[in-house]
Amino acid sequence: MSLNQIQRACFCSGGVKKKKKPKYRFGFPMALYFFFEKLNFSYWTSTTVNPNHYVCVLPSEAGQALASVLGGELFLAKSQLVEATAFDLTGQGAEAGDLLVFLRNNGVVLSYSFYFFLLKKRITFFLHGGDKVSSLESFYSNANWLEREISEMFRGSNLLKKESRNLLLDYGSSFNPFLKKFPSTGHAEVVFNSFLKTTAYVQTAGVEL
């Protein structure tokens, strides 16, 4: 190779930026994939809206095992329970999307959303197919408050839970306002008294116009 060819090769390679290798080879945490692969396990992600957010569907009996894995694995231990809620899918058809094919006819479906600081990813788990789910408060302290709101609004119950009193409604209240069968219009309503700091379940009076 001549001197001019060597100089030209060095000049051309000097302007090329070397691509950085991705910090994590797999997009979805492989520890979770191998752990739940024998279950009815499915996950989705969107590279258009938010590429670091995954949605997973698991049977309800996997809730306690899920928390133990999230708290014990090296790259999953640095995680935070961001949100916990529920959805009443009673009467929901499969035409709403592929995700609901796994969730339909399950009544109330729980949803737990975690953020993993080391992986920089957010994963939302839907737990379906059961009325009772093991509590996550032994692994995440804020699960105590969030699960109490779910059980109060959606008539759910958590196993191994230390505190199950109502937060938003009066103690001893047996109605669940967020269920689809709750008569939200026409017959009854929940009224909050700001002076007495109490809530009341009262019958609505029909008015003719």
UniProtKB/Swiss-Prot annotation:
EC numbers: 7.1.1.2
Reactions accelerated catalytically: a ubiquinone + NADH + 5 H(+)(in) = a ubiquinol + NAD(+) + 4 H(+)(out)
Top class in the EC scheme: translocase
Cytoplasm as UniProt keyword: no
SUPFAM superfamilies registered for this protein in UniProt: Nqo5-like
PROSITE patterns tied to this protein: COMPLEX1_30K
GO MF annotation, one: NADH dehydrogenase (ubiquinone) activity
Gene Ontology cellular-component terms listed: mitochondrial inner membrane
Function comment: Core subunit of the mitochondrial membrane respiratory chain NADH dehydrogenase (Complex I) that is believed to belong to the minimal assembly required for catalysis. Complex I functions in the transfer of electrons from NADH to the respiratory chain. The immediate electron acceptor for the enzyme is believed to be ubiquinone.
Family: Belongs to the complex I 30 kDa subunit family.
SUBUNIT field: Complex I is composed of about 30 different subunits.
Name of the protein in its database record: NADH-ubiquinone oxidoreductase subunit 9
Organism of derivation: Paramecium tetraurelia
Gene: NAD9
